[in-house]
Regions:
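Bacterial N-terminal signal peptides that target proteins for export
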Residues: 4-18
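Sterically constrained small-residue positions within well-ordered secondary structures
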Residues: 24, 43-45, 76, 117, ...
C-alpha cells in the first residue's frame, strides 16, 4: 500500500495527470505579468514552509513527518494566501511513471495539510512535475533524495520566476 507499481496502477488518469501538468505549465507561463517582486505574504510562505522529502518510489510516507506537521501548523497560524503544492521525483524512471508518482506525492501532502486543519480552499492546485525542475543534477543517492520532494509555494512565486 502506498507503493506505486508499474503496470498495476496504470489507467487513463495517468494520461490525464500528464496532460494536466503540461496544461498548467503552459497556462501559468503565459499568464505571467511583469511582477516587481514578491509580496510580504509570499516571502513569509517561502521562508517558513519547508520542502517535504520522500523515500524512493513512495508517495504516502515522508522522510521526516515533523516537517509536514510544522508546515501545517504554520499555514494554520497564517491563514491568508493561496497555495500551490508541487510534487517531484528523481530522474530515474520514465516520464509518465514519475509524473504520476510526483502527482500522488503532491495530493498526499495536500490531504495531510487538510487533515491537520489547513483550509482546503487555499490550495489552488496540487500537481506533479515528475523529473522536471531538478534541484540537484548529480547522479548519487544524496542528490536523488533532494529531487524526491514536494514544495508548497504561493502562486505569485512561480509566476514571478517564470516571468524573469
Amino acid at each position: 500500500m502506498g507503493k506505486f507499481v508499474r503496470g498495476k496502477n496504470t489507467s487513463s488518469w495517468m494520461r490525464a495527470a500528464f496532460c494536466l501538468a503540461l496544461i498548467l505549465a503552459c497556462c501559468a507561463a503565459t499568464a505571467v505579468g511583469q511582477s516587481q517582486g514578491l509580496s510580504a505574504q509570499a516571502q513569509a510562505i517561502n521562508q517558513n514552509v519547508k520542502e517535504v522529502y520522500f523515500p524512493f518510489n513512495i508517495y504516502n510516507r515522508v522522510i521526516d513527518a515533523k516537517t509536514v506537521d510544522a508546515n501545517a501548523d504554520w499555514l494554520k497560524q497564517n491563514p491568508d494566501g493561496k497555495l500551490w503544492i508541487q510534487g517531484y521525483a528523481d530522474p530515474r524512471g520514465d516520464i509518465v511513471y514519475n509524473l504520476v508518482l510526483s502527482y500522488r506525492r503532491a495530493q498526499w501532502v495536500k490531504a495531510q495539510f487538510v487533515k491537520r486543519g489547513v483550509d482546503a480552499s487555499r490550495i489552488e492546485y496540487a500537481t506533479g512535475w515528475g523529473k522536471l525542475y531538478q534541484t540537484c543534477q548529480q547522479t548519487d543517492d544524496k542528490c536523488f533524495q533532494q529531487n524526491r520532494r514536494v514544495d508548497t509555494v504561493p502562486p505569485e512565486d512561480l509566476l514571478f520566476h517564470w516571468g524573469q
